Amino acid sequence: RYIKNNNSYIILYPDYLNKKRFHGSLTEGIYRNMQYALDNYNYKYFIVLSSRNIFYTELNPEKYKYFIKNSFKKRLNELSEKWHWPSILRSEISKYIIRNNLYFSKSAHEGVTFDYNACKDILSFLNRNDYIRKNLFEWNSCMEEFALQSICINHSQPYYDIGNGTNTNYNINDL
């Protein structure tokens, strides 16, 4: 299935997944799309879009130079009690991060962008850690705002914010 958009195509994942807000099923949808893209296409960037995304200009390869790496990373003791951390910290991926003294990272999922190597690392990590993946997809919190981003940060892979989500508007007018 395709959506035509100015002579280019957006490819939709062929199997519909019923997702819920504030639930790991959103992360599962991103994971499935990422796996599908990796298995079927050559690409440079994987962009997570939602109905909340707004682009102010045309996005094309010449705009990639404006992508700004998200470098948010904090250890457990640096996280605030606010946001969704109290719930998220009980998940298996958080326990893994804590147990291995790794970093937490976060960003709005609307417009979060991963390069090809980051996608490979995310999928490899989740496919090797089945119990984390299953728990992640079933967790009742907004896992899409931190899980994949944290995997990137801890595997020295960049991720970018190009969307108009919370606190990610720093380069939106360049895109």
Where would I find each of the regions flagged by the language model?
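Active-site-proximal specificity loops/subdomain of glycosyltransferases
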Residues: 2-44, 48-49
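Short, solvent-exposed loop/turn segments at secondary-structure junctions
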Residues: 17-18, 53-55, 119, 165-168
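Conserved glycosyltransferase catalytic-site signature
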Residues: 23-31, 53, 141-149
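A structural signal for short, well-ordered beta-strand segments and their strand-loop junctions
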Residues: 45-50, 57, 68, 113, ...
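Amphipathic alpha-helical segments that form well-ordered structural scaffolds
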Residues: 32, 118-121, 147-154
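C-terminal catalytic/acceptor-binding lobe
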Residues: 127-175
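Conserved catalytic core of nucleotide-sugar-dependent glycosyltransferases
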Residues: 54-136, 141, 145
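Short, surface-exposed basic-aromatic patches at helix termini and helix-loop junctions that form
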Residues: 2-6, 38-39, 60-67, 154-155
